[in-house]
Amino acid sequence: MSSVTMRDMLKAGVHFGHQTRYWNPKMNTYIFGARNKIHIINLEQTLPLFNDAMAFLNKLAASNNKILFVGTKRAAQKAVSEEAQRCGMPYVDHRWLGGMLTNWKTIRQSIKRYRELEAQFQDGTFDKLTKKEALMRKREMDKLERSIGGIKDMGGLPDALFVIDVDHEDIALQEARKLGIPVVAVVDTNSNPDGVDYVIPGNDDAIRAIQLYVKAAADVILEGKQYAQNQTGGESEFVEVADEAAGEKAEG
């Protein structure tokens, strides 16, 4: 399971919240105090909650479930796309398109179109077109790549969302809630934790903190996938194996 320590979190600045005047009272329980008008998050609360969230992601991956990484703010884009790809999970790292979950049928058509354009680009079809037509198709393909390239292999609705910054990704959260899809999210002191199934109280702005969250998530997902590969029985069997292994690691 996750090997992230409190020292790692301190180094990454996970404990730095927002300016005190921007706080959300619903985050009060996770706040240690304030320093220079900046709220300090209580890492003694964050660490166990973070571990719970990682255990949940691990269990999902061990059952061959899909976890959609969501981080469209500039500080999160690179880490989200790189780590999601590393663990073979879908991701959204640019603008969240309204209806990405609730209007999946339409999104699926866009994915189909993107695949067609990708195939045409690769098999030389673009070369046979007029320069203007080829340019138009290339632009269309690039636009689709930015918006849905990360979910082209998702194949259906995800089993959970892993979100950086719930304020920034409020539409994604609303859609997940509407469909009953569990949400794991990093929630800063200025945000509302309501509707998040696994709250990770922490800095959602610092690149190092974001890298820590998504790298740990990718690591536990890869572990879960490995359990799934190694198992020979049914679903419940390998979930138990994942739990046992997590327990052994915690004890060791």
UniProtKB/Swiss-Prot annotation:
One Pfam family, short name: Ribosomal_S2
Record keywords, A-Z: Ribonucleoprotein, Ribosomal protein
Acyltransferase as UniProt keyword: no
The keyword Ribosomal protein appears for this protein: yes
Gene3D superfamilies: Glucose-6-phosphate isomerase like protein, domain 1, Helix hairpin bin
Domain of life of the organism encoding this protein: Bacteria
GO BP term, pick one: translation
GO CC, any one term: cytosolic small ribosomal subunit
GO MF terms, alphabetically ordered: structural constituent of ribosome
InterPro entries the record matches: Ribosomal_uS2, Ribosomal_uS2_bac/mit/plastid, Ribosomal_uS2_CS, Ribosomal_uS2_flav_dom_sf
SUPFAM superfamilies for this protein: Ribosomal protein S2
CDD domains per UniProt: RPS2
Family statement: Belongs to the universal ribosomal protein uS2 family.
Protein name (record): Small ribosomal subunit protein uS2
